[in-house]
């Protein structure tokens, strides 16, 4: 299996992010997504470390990961794995669940990340084939089709409840303060001692309560913020070297390595495919 990846934004659903990739040796570092991650495994076997357990997703399976929940991914077999992913917004899936249940509800909750639903897998694979075309000739038709498939995914496999069965533990009041501090100073360099002084908590306790609330330790959340900013700023013509420094990375090499570990493609590839 040849390692290759293409990431782009489709015009449907207000720039839906799409990733088609094949990997053998590449592994995704532990990270989170702002939106839902809905993927299909088209070849090989993927391993996903999620909610404290390692799950395997073979060819023909669907993988759904909740927004904000930390996870890492890698090839479960030597031959690697190929997958297609879309990242529908939380609001979109929530609206679909409201339509399905006809009552106000929380964010859809998927109890298991790996789903076996062959008919839905085949339908999603067909939708991805249409998404991969250089130009989408009938955006309305494709958007309607994808909405139908996502509604089917939610109705068959999400928990229909007003409250998610997986609620985070009590959130220490300083967690939001540290999150806000990192969000407004993401380009700066910090040590855990810096954040400890900022919060008034010991480094160990801060790391524990932050991970429990956010799904990532503070340093990984800082990387998440930088990657999110990079995705936005790659739409501009700023040089990658300057962008790396502006975002707080040591240099372009550090930026490139980190971006690929989180997104699956290099910053240069991501920028080039934004224009497709």
Across the structure, where does each feature detected by a protein language model lie?
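N-terminal regulatory/effector-sensing and dimerization cores
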Residues: 2-106, 133-136
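Amphipathic, well-ordered alpha-helical segments in soluble domains
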Residues: 37-40, 89-92, 123, 145, ...
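Extended, non-catalytic scaffold segments that flank or surround catalytic motifs
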Residues: 44-45, 117, 273
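Residue-level signal for well-ordered alpha-helical positions
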Residues: 51, 76, 96-100, 156, ...
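Short, Lys/Arg-enriched, Trp-marked, Pro/Gly-tolerant hinge/linker segments that flank
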Residues: 105-121, 131-199, 212-220, 224
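Short, Lys/Arg-enriched alpha-helical recognition elements, typified by the DNA-recognition helix
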Residues: 124-128
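Terminal helix-turn-helix DNA-binding modules in bacterial transcription factors
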Residues: 176, 180-184, 188-193, 201, ...
């Amino acid at each position: 299996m040849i390692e290759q990846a293409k990431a782009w934004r489709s015009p449907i659903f207000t720039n839906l992010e799409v990733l088609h990739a094949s990997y053998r040796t590449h592994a995704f570092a532990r990270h989170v997504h702002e939106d839902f991650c809905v993927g299909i495994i088209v070849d090989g076997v993927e391993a996903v470390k999620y909610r404290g357990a390692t799950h395997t997703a073979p060819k023909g399976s669907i993988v759904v990961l909740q927004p904000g929940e930390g996870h890492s991914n890698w090839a479960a077999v030597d031959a690697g794995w190929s997958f297609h992913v879309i990242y529908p917004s939380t609001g979109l899936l929530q609206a679909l669940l409201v339509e399905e249940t006809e009552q106000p509800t929380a964010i859809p909750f998927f109890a298991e990340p790996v789903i076996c639903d062959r008919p839905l897998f085949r339908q999603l694979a067909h939708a991805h084939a249409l998404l991969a075309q250089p130009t989408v000739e009938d955006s309305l038709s494709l958007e309607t089709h994808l909405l139908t498939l996502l509604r089917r995914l939610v109705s068959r496999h999400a928990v229909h409840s007003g409250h998610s069965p997986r609620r985070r533990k009590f959130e220490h009041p300083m967690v939001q303060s540290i999150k806000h501090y990192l969000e407004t100073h993401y380009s700066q360099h910090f040590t855990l001692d810096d954040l400890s002084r900022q919060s008034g908590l010991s480094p160990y306790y801060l790391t524990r309560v932050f991970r429990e609330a956010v799904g990532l330790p503070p340093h990984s959340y800082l990387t998440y913020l930088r990657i999110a900013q990079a995705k936005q700023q790659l739409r501009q013509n700023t040089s990658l070297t300057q962008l790396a420094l502006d975002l707080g990375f040591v240099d372009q090499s550090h930026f490139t390595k980190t971006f690929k570990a989180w997104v699956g493609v290099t910053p240069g590839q991501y920028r080039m495919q934004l224009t497709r």
